[in-house]
Regions:
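N-terminal amphipathic/basic leader segments beginning at the initiator methionine
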Residues: 1-21
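Alpha/beta enzyme core
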Residues: 13, 26-31, 37-327
Length: 327
């Protein structure tokens, strides 16, 4: 039998397989999510996220050093305040937990690139992502507090802001506020297509942000919808977003691919807490090879079109990339 085309030729040895890889990744594309809790001398494990911790601002340096040693130089900060109220006023407090954390990191590790999550759910006493009018989130009133929060983060030293609230018009509101205060070069990474997903459970435990009533389907996207994601991304581009994001990642690889193909902005994907927790639990139970599944799932997200990956596995993935196992 004569065969002139034999795909196996390019799979014959590891050196050759690495040379012809179609998807190339590096630690420069990784962002590590980090939880800051108000207080002092705190490092507490997060039961729902094996291997992850909440840090007070005075101890966050421990995790920053660990990230830098692993080759990860970008973090995404989430805050857990001591005080919560109806309007989430701790979110834009100049001495709030995120603002303290930003200053603490930048003072000691100016090379660390800091992205901050901009939302209200961790700061409101009702756990919803904005200002309530009855039992509904008032979209337009929420825009003002989101913009104030983003500005307070940038004034504290944040390099980039990432609004995750899913209010209509938030990118335009934040962009205008930052520009008006002279921060025209501060980029916005928008949670553009953020779905109302069941995969967020461990995060809500970690951040203490579960809604006190109802759910978030009135503002986060319906998992049934594909075209709506394109509309959300297009609106964010029009309003001035610099980076688009799809969240979650693994169950929405089709959305990552379509948005990546359709728009010329960098595409981020957030491999969320539920994805991480499932891999950790299955690995601990001996059902899967945790390391290989971690690498394979991350690779699938990049292959779908993501340029940036936000993941709790960032440090482990950076090592795999540096050793040539991935990318």
């Amino acid at each position: 039998m004569e065969m002139s085309i034999r795909p196996r030729r390019l799979r014959s040895c590891e050196n050759l397989r690495r040379m012809v890889r179609e998807t190339r990744v590096s630690p420069e594309s990784l962002i590590y999510p980090l939880f800051l809790i108000e207080g002092e001398n705190i490092k507490e494990p997060i039961p729902s996220l094996d291997g992850q911790y909440r840090y007070s601002p005075d101890r966050v340096w421990e995790e920053i050093e660990s990230c830098l040693a692993a080759g990860v130089s970008r973090v995404l900060l989430f805050g857990i305040p001591a005080h919560k109220d109806a309007c989430g006023s701790s979110a834009w407090d100049p001495n709030g937990v995120v603002q303290q954390g930003i200053r603490a990191i930048k003072e000691k590790y100016p090379q660390m690139y800091i992205v901050t999550d901009v939302c209200m759910c961790e700061y409101t006493d009702h756990g919803h992502c904005g200002i309530l009018c009855g039992h509904n989130v008032d979209n337009d009133k929420t825009l003002e507090v989101l913009a104030k929060t983003a500005l307070s983060h940038v004034e504290a030293g944040a390099d980039m802001v990432a609004p995750s609230d899913m209010m209509d018009g938030r990118i335009a509101a934040i962009r205008e506020t930052l520009d008006d205060h002279g921060y025209v070069n501060t980029p916005i990474m928008s949670y553009s297509a953020k779905y109302a997903s069941a995969f967020y459970g461990p995060f809500r435990d970690a951040a203490g942000s579960a809604p006190a009533f109802g759910d978030r389907r009135g503002y986060q996207m319906d998992p049934h919808n594909r075209k709506e994601a394109m509309k959300e991304c297009a609106l964010d581009v029009e309003e001035g977003a610099d980076i688009l994001m799809v969240k979650p990642a693994l169950s929405y690889l089709d959305i990552i691919r379509e948005c990546s193909d359709a728009f010329d902005l960098p595409m981020a994907a957030y491999s969320v807490s539920g994805e991480y927790a499932m891999i950790k639990a299955a690995g601990k139970a001996g059902l899967i090879d945790e390391h290989r599944v971690m690498c394979e799932s991350a690779l699938s997200i990049y292959r779908a079109g993501a340029n940036i990956l936000i993941t709790y596995f960032a440090k482990e993935l950076a090592k795999a990339m540096q050793e040539g196992e991935l990318g």
